[in-house]
Amino acid sequence: MEANKIIITGGATRIGASIARKLSGPGVELVIHFNKSKRKAERLKKELLKNKTRVYLVKGDLSKENEVNKILKFAKSKLKYFDCLINNASLFENDKLENFTTDSWGKHLRTNLRTPALLSKEFAKNIKGKNNNIINIIDQRIFKLTPFFFSYTISKTGLYTLTKTSAMSLAPKVRVNGIAPGPTIKNKRQSEKHFKKQFMATPLKRQVNVSEICNAVEFFINNKSITGQVLAIDSGQNLNWQTPDITGGKE
């Protein structure tokens, strides 16, 4: 696999940690960003060191530009140059048009859209060769819009657009693609019952395995003829005409 100088935001837990494991190995250097998950980040680092991966941990609040700049400075000092950026971290809070606040709106847009844009800009300035990749972790809801999770959805549809436009801007040296996951890992708002209801309501009636998302990341890195694409890995959830948030389930 042609990715050895890698930055992963939100890489200490959940999907981000699984991607870090997938991309790790001898000769690989990983900068793993975290915010509140220091212990999990340290455990992951210890795990990855066993397979001869060089791991560098960096803490930062992605809603604050000065902290994003510190992350970039740290990554440059450790890796010297980059060949893969995984914009995985995101803020996911529920609001609607009727009750959103400027604080919630701002945090979602800064964390989920502005920061990936800033990281992408600096990534493109610090590359070598022509096989460089940015992979944005988005959300299947960009293909199946609802009025729920208003600020989050706006930020993720923006990230979808960023994926497309940056693929145009950064070609041919950087390929930019995205993954739009469906029900993969239960979130803090959901009970096991509600999560099962969510994935059983998909056409394929199955939970997305995180390994399938990791395989897609590897596929995008290895396939040099793909850019500007967003792949839904969601058991067909974006095809539903009635989604759990409409029928009374929790997301």
Question: What is the predicted role of each segment?
Answer:
Residues 12-14:
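Conserved glycine-rich cofactor-binding loop
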Residues 88-93, 236:
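Conserved NAD(P)H cofactor-binding loop of Rossmann-fold oxidoreductase domains
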Residues 96-97, 104-109, 198:
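Substrate-binding pocket helix/loop in short-chain dehydrogenase/reductase
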